[in-house]
């Protein structure tokens, strides 16, 4: 049976429009209430920004054989046990017949600050995955096949995220591919290496300008970290687990 990719490109464009629209709506609401956060924070604290991407992921799961699985989106049901910490809160969990089928993180990064936030996102992504796989090794989820672990990042496409960045490393040289790399390129390299090191089943990064609130246009950085690769891998895993578990 062919995998159903649920017209993911159109749904991704809708998700991009919703992302920027929700940020602006949250910012305007806080301004009107007189409780506006400083700078870009207002658009973040409103939440809901990645809901369009969440809906896309849900469609992939339901279209490829696990519409009847436990698909958790509510905060109270999104924790998994960790190894280095008691629990970790995920953005989406899929559980079927007592097995963890998928755990997915949906992240975004909007300017003007890219430096510190990039480092924080990197450390979080690596730590989260290492914690989960160590817990898996210790049978925190029982004896079962490896779950799908996905990481999807939406980054603002802006001059600040595309310009070359210099690094200071006085004792030992930085890896060549990082020298002068923009933050978008660094996210692409991060996602590639998260997959190469088997920390995530697949990791994707897309970039979109604020003007995409009207068009939904977005850019992908490489085939390995593309949205199609993410969606295809998820659809394949879901279909395989649906067939295995019946």
Swiss-Prot record:
It catalyses: Endonucleolytic cleavage of DNA to give specific double-stranded fragments with terminal 5'-phosphates. Its EC number is 3.1.21.4. The keyword Protein biosynthesis does not apply. Its cofactor is Mg(2+). Keywords: Endonuclease, Hydrolase, Magnesium, Nuclease, Plasmid, Restriction system. InterPro entries: Restrct_endonuc_II_XhoI. It is an enzyme of class 3 (hydrolase). GO terms for molecular function: DNA binding; type II site-specific deoxyribonuclease activity. GO terms for biological process: DNA restriction-modification system. Belongs to the XhoI type II restriction endonuclease family. Homodimer. This is Type II restriction enzyme PaeR7I. It comes from Pseudomonas aeruginosa. The lineage of its organism: Bacteria, Pseudomonadati, Pseudomonadota, Gammaproteobacteria, Pseudomonadales. The gene is paeR7IR.
């Amino acid at each position: 049976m062919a995998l159903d990719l649920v017209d993911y490109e159109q749904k991704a464009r809708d998700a991009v429009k919703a992302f920027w629209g929700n940020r602006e709506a949250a910012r305007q609401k806080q301004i009107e209430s007189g409780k506006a956060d400083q700078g870009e924070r207002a658009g973040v604290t409103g939440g809901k920004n990645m809901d369009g991407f969440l809906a896309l992921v849900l469609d992939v799961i339901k279209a490829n054989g696990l519409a009847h699985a436990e698909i958790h989106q509510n905060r109270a049901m999104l924790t998994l046990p960790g190894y280095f910490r008691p629990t970790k809160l995920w953005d989406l969990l899929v559980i079927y017949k007592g097995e963890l089928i998928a755990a997915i993180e949906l992240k975004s990064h909007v300017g003007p600050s890219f430096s510190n936030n990039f480092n924080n996102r990197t450390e979080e992504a690596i730590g989260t995955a290492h914690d989960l796989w160590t817990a898996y090794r210790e049978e925190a989820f029982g004896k079962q096949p490896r779950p799908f672990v996905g990481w999807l990042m939406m980054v603002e496409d802006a001059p600040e995220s595309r310009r070359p960045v210099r690094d200071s490393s006085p004792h030992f040289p930085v890896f060549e591919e990082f020298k002068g790399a923009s933050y978008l390129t660094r996210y692409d390299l991060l996602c590639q290496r998260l997959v190469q090191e088997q920390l995530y089943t697949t990791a994707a990064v897309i970039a979109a300008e604020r003007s995409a609130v009207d068009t939904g246009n977005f850019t992908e950085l490489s085939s390995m970290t593309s949205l199609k690769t993410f969606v295809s891998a998820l659809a394949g895993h879901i279909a395989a687990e649906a067939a295995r578990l019946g």
